[in-house]
């Protein structure tokens, strides 16, 4: 695993938080925070991406598996932000599970 994986996730979360605060009109991320379905829009995306991940795994399609995994991580980070949580909350929970 690359040493900068944590940095990439931290950077992505910072972008998500910025989009949440500033709500640029042309931002997919901002649209998730203002969607008429609210958090259900993100929950639906997580369900959809999880199904796609399962199918990629069953097909042994590692390229698609990586793509769908990234989609899940992204939407999970959006959900954490919606719930006023952050990366440190996730890190703390993962640390408990070592």
Swiss-Prot record:
Gene Ontology terms: biological process: L-histidine biosynthetic process
GO molecular function, one term: phosphoribosyl-ATP diphosphatase activity
GO CC annotations, alphabetized: cytoplasm
Keyword Amino-acid biosynthesis among record annotations: yes
TM spans (from-to): none
Catalytic activity entry: 1-(5-phospho-beta-D-ribosyl)-ATP + H2O = 1-(5-phospho-beta-D-ribosyl)-5'-AMP + diphosphate + H(+)
Entry EC number(s): 3.6.1.31
Record key words, sorted: Amino-acid biosynthesis, ATP-binding, Cytoplasm, Histidine biosynthesis, Hydrolase, Nucleotide-binding
Cell location: Cytoplasm
Keyword check for ATP-binding: yes
Pathway: Amino-acid biosynthesis; L-histidine biosynthesis; L-histidine from 5-phospho-alpha-D-ribose 1-diphosphate: step 2/9
Entry's family note: Belongs to the PRA-PH family.
HAMAP family: HisE
Name of the protein: Phosphoribosyl-ATP pyrophosphatase
Lineage of origin: Archaea, Methanobacteriati, Methanobacteriota, Stenosarchaea group, Halobacteria
Gene: hisE
């Amino acid at each position: 695993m690359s040493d900068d994986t944590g940095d990439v996730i931290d950077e992505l979360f910072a972008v998500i938080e910025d989009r949440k605060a500033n709500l640029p009109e042309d931002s997919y991320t901002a649209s998730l925070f203002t969607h008429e379905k609210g958090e259900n829009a993100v929950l639906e995306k997580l369900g959809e991406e999880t199904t796609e991940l399962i199918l990629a795994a069953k097909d042994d399609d590692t390229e698609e598996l990586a793509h769908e995994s990234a989609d899940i991580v992204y939407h999970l980070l959006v959900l954490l932000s919606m719930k006023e949580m952050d990366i440190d909350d996730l890190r703390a929970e993962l640390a408990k599970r070592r």
